[in-house]
Amino acid sequence: MIIYNILIVLLLAINTLANPILPASPNATIVGGEKALAGECPYQISLQSSSHFCGGTILDEYWILTAAHCVAGQTASKLSIRYNSLKHSLGGEKISVAKIFAHEKYDSYQIDNDIALIKLKSPMKLNQKNAKAVGLPAKGSDVKVGDQVRVSGWGYLEEGSYSLPSELRRVDIAVVSRKECNELYSKANAEVTDNMICGGDVANGGKDSCQGDSGGPVVDVKNNQVVGIVSWGYGCARKGYPGVYTRVGNFIDWIESKRSQ
């Protein structure tokens, strides 16, 4: 998750706000969640250079869904993924990345179209307890306000932390309306577009993704579909500022066009 700094908000406004915290921490960790049990988030992978820096979601044996801000400026030959493990630093298997496909209209200023696909050099061995693909939502579909979705990752456990947890964590959050989310973020000069969804406890805070979770899955557990990608937010689990996630339903045609290459 890209994190906004309050002083930068006041002094430099949206242009600086949109700059991500660069690897090894463009993604956020899970705040207010708990350790994921074996089999709870089998679609989760760790995207790595020399170590973990972003999350991702298994779509099939060759394809990983992640955020464009995670792969911006990255070279495929220097990246790998670890899957089939609840730990980002050991266990499971590692596979090298063959190709990176970031959305052509990714806007690092507004953090819009924050979606990317990764193709692996060799196939993953799926249908294991901690290694399974997740489905995609219908084209153009949106999440319903109030519905619960699951966010997972190895991000920081609190804002300002600089230590990643060794084990995968997850949190269930409620979807917040796009209108309300836009009203909240207008105070920080940020815009929530139709390509984004929001989630969290607006009234109390305390549940969110944080640095180290970027690119990771937001899943409708009931339907086993990845409906979002961890993208950006203002701090971590702050009251009045829900997390903002890429709306996967708006990119189904784009995803399928890349997977056919």
Swiss-Prot record:
Pfam families: Trypsin. Residues 19-29 form a propeptide. SMART domains: Tryp_SPc (SM00020). GO terms for cellular component: extracellular region. Its main location: secreted. The keyword Membrane does not apply. One of its GO terms (biological process) is proteolysis. Its EC number is 3.4.21.-. GO terms for molecular function: serine-type endopeptidase activity. Disulfide bonds join 54-70, 181-198, 210-236. Residues 30-260 form the Peptidase S1 domain. CDD domains: Tryp_SPc. This is Mite allergen Der p 3. It comes from Dermatophagoides pteronyssinus (European house dust mite). The gene is DERP3.
